[in-house]
Amino acid sequence: AWYVPCLASLETLQELCRKENLSCKSIGITNKSLRRYEVEYLCDYKVEEGTEYYLVKWKGWPESSNTWEPHENLNCPLLLQNFLRDKDEFLSRMREGKALKVRNHVKALKPVVADYIVKKAKQRIALQRWKEELNRKKNHKAMILVENTVDLEGPPLDFYYINEYKPAPGINVINGITTGCECTDCPTEKCCPKEAGFILAYNKRKKLKIQPGLPIYECNSFCRCGPDCPNRIVQKGTPYSLCIFRTNNGRGWGVKTLQEIKTNSFVMEYVGEVITSEEAERRGQLYDNQGNTYLFDLDYDSDEFTVDAARYGNVSHFVNHSCDPNLQVFNVFIDNLDLRLPRIALFSTRTIKAGEELTFDYQMKGSMDLSSDSADGLSPSKKRIRTVCKCGALCCRGYLN
């Protein structure tokens, strides 16, 4: 019910732009491609009378305009490299599965091979556009990369990137802050955490120092302290470059860090659509059947609201579960002190190496401070169908719920 059919295909839009001599970078029509032919990707290969030919898809032109070009006419080494790598990758898989008899030297590619190469090229273009879209919409300096070396899955069709909570119709999120601390050198006895009855969450190195279950109160937009205040961490956004990547063990998309992350460092927020608990129960039944887990109850103080990151979210939407995670959830209050609507922040529980996948426990048990009154302040929304866990941890519980 959430999908809306396109009014025109990408190729139709490209052809219209070309006829009207209009450039549109988002659909691949640039001033450069309007003036001259530009190779978008290579589709096929053949040898005729000793000459190698490649079938070329021209940027901004429909596939019906593809032409065979001799190797010496090509001036696209990267695209040729992609073509050869995709071909070798596919043939290698076929040899392993013995599903296709292949030879190292061929005069023409089998249709199934050429079809895979074209799909891979289209996927590469789609993922590149998605990466550019994510980086346009993010509100932090660190980069977001996208990578899929596993299958032909492209960008999610019904996912919209947001940087903060999106209240559902009928829900009003009011930032009730009208005053802030008078500190010029936080923290002091009258700093925001102390005024709320808690200790400062960070040490001098801006690393987390409190136990799980305790809330984080950061300085807000009315405070006198500047942007370098040691109590302004979560509000600055993700400080690390991250990569959304396709996992090779059936867990769909995942997220890995491209930089080393030290212990107790802020990594990212979990954002999504804020809905009522009643609506969460209704949606939960749908998600259960799909095997998805995107609902989080905001039950730090009450059980009135839930965050649904299925359609609206940020990079955290793609973070997988692990029974032995390297991220921990904390409730954060900044410009909104409504205890029913804490912000959800993910902090590292240990040093995470560059290239390592980021995970958190969807049940968030084990490392929680059970002596705290708010130890169960944030928990995944109740689920009715058990989902098998594929985290692979030695301590795996077998199920996500």
Q: Predicted regions: what is each one?
A:
Residues R36-N75, W253-V271, T349-Q363, S367:
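Conserved tryptophan-centered aromatic signature that marks the ligand-binding surface of SH3
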Residues A1-G154, Y161-N163:
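Long, charged, low-complexity intrinsically disordered regions
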Residues L13-R35, I216, F222-R246:
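Disordered, polybasic Ser/Thr-rich segments at the N-terminal boundary of pleckstrin homology
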Residues Y160-P239, K382-N401:
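Cys/His-rich Zn2+-coordinating "finger/knuckle" modules used by eukaryotic regulatory proteins
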Residues E20-S26, L34-K46, Y53, D158-P167, ...:
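Eukaryotic beta-rich interaction modules
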Residues Q211-L214, S221, R232-I334, R340, ...:
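Catalytic cores of histone-lysine modification enzymes
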Residues E49-E52, P62-N66, S92, N175, ...:
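Eukaryotic short linear interaction motifs
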Residues A1, L34, K57-L91, P239, ...:
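Aromatic/acidic cage segments in peptide-binding pockets
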